[in-house]
From Swiss-Prot:
Lineage, top ranks: Bacteria, Pseudomonadati, Pseudomonadota, Alphaproteobacteria, Sphingomonadales
Transmembrane annotation, as ranges: 28-48, 90-110, 125-145, 158-178, 187-207, 216-236, 239-259
GO MF annotations in UniProt: proton-transporting ATP synthase activity, rotational mechanism
GO cellular component assignments: plasma membrane; proton-transporting ATP synthase complex
Intracellular or extracellular location(s): Cell inner membrane
Family: Belongs to the ATPase A chain family.
Keywords: ATP synthesis, Cell inner membrane, Cell membrane, CF(0), Hydrogen ion transport, Ion transport, Membrane, Transmembrane, Transmembrane helix, Transport
Pfam families referenced in this protein's UniProt entry, alphabetically: ATP-synt_A
Gene3D superfamilies the record matches: ATP synthase, F0 complex, subunit A
Name of the protein in its database record: ATP synthase subunit a
Subunit structure: F-type ATPases have 2 components, CF(1) - the catalytic core - and CF(0) - the membrane proton channel. CF(1) has five subunits: alpha(3), beta(3), gamma(1), delta(1), epsilon(1). CF(0) has three main subunits: a(1), b(2) and c(9-12). The alpha and beta chains form an alternating ring which encloses part of the gamma chain. CF(1) is attached to CF(0) by a central stalk formed by the gamma and epsilon chains, while a peripheral stalk is formed by the delta and b chains.
Topology of the protein relative to the lipid bilayer: Multi-pass membrane protein
Record function comment: Key component of the proton channel; it plays a direct role in the translocation of protons across the membrane.
Principal location class: membrane
Gene source species: Zymomonas mobilis subsp. mobilis (strain ATCC 31821 / ZM4 / CP4)
Length: 266
């Protein structure tokens, strides 16, 4: 008989209200997603506050903050140049928030926060779309503020043959419009896929294929299937930590490249 208590791989993405609040017809309840975004922002604030102390001999915390700030600063300098310095705080905040939000979803709390199981807020397209809108909105504001209608020159690459002048701007404009969608969907899909895979593998360990089985069958099952699956989960979990960092980096990198287009028109 098939097991009836299978793990639902999509349950982890369910947004649940922790504190109900309604204003008229609008539901503005404080949810688990909002909680973990607040925790991510608090973790970022604590991380930065710990690095503000300029000790003569920096400790590990201060060194970690300096490494991260230098990393983002080098990214901005390489991709935008000196004109990109004013946007370093924005790119740093996006990078660190996404990094913390991604990583917090992988932290096993084991009931330390009752009713607040780990939740990856970046696994919801509404969150990633908001982050993408912030990045893309900044690009538009910077582009039109600095260049006015000359910003549309971005859609006519230098050296475009006259024979293609009717075609290239349309392709470039379409590619430009797709940028926020690709930013949002890339992060959303990457975070969702990895977590679903971990839940599916966990189901093989928690639920044997036969609900009522002999001890001998269960021993053989966990030896041949359970242990290898558990080891595979450890490897995939380690890979997920790497994916969390890579996705935060890619989001920040693309934001800096898009800002470069808006600032330098190339």
């Amino acid at each position: 008989m098939a097991a009836t208590n299978n793990v639902d791989p999509m349950h982890q993405f369910t947004v649940e209200p922790l504190h109900g609040l309604h204003i008229g017809k609008y539901d503005i309840s404080f949810t688990n997603s909002a909680l973990w975004m607040v925790i991510a922002m608090a973790a970022l604030a604590i991380f930065m506050a710990g690095g503000r102390r300029k000790a003569l001999i920096p400790g590990r915390w201060q060194m970690a903050v300096e490494v991260m700030t230098r990393f983002v600063n080098d990214m901005v300098s390489t991709n935008i140049g000196p004109k990109g310095r004013p946007f370093t705080p924005l790119i740093f905040t996006l990078f660190m928030f996404i990094l913390f939000a991604n990583l917090l979803g992988l932290v096993p709390l084991f009931g330390f926060l009752p009713g607040a199981e780990p939740f990856t807020s970046t696994s919801h397209v509404t969150v990633t779309a908001t982050l993408a809108a912030i990045a893309f909105g900044t690009v538009l504001v910077v582009g039109f503020t600095r260049h006015g209608l000359g910003f549309f020159k971005l859609f006519v690459p230098h050296g475009t043959p006259m024979a293609l002048i009717w075609l290239i701007p349309g392709i470039e404009a379409f590619s430009f419009i797709l940028r926020p969608f690709s930013l949002a969907l890339r992060l959303f899909v990457a975070m969702t896929a990895g977590h679903v895979l971990l839940e599916v593998l966990a189901n093989f360990i928690v639920n044997p294929p036969v609900q009522s089985a002999s001890p001998a069958f269960l021993a053989g099952y966990y030896t041949l299937v359970g242990i290898p699956t558990f080891l595979l989960m450890i490897g995939i979990s380690a890979l997920e930590f790497l994916v969390c960092a890579i996705q935060a980096y890619v989001f920040a990198l693309l934001t800096s490249l898009y800002l470069n287009d808006a600032i330098n028109l190339h």
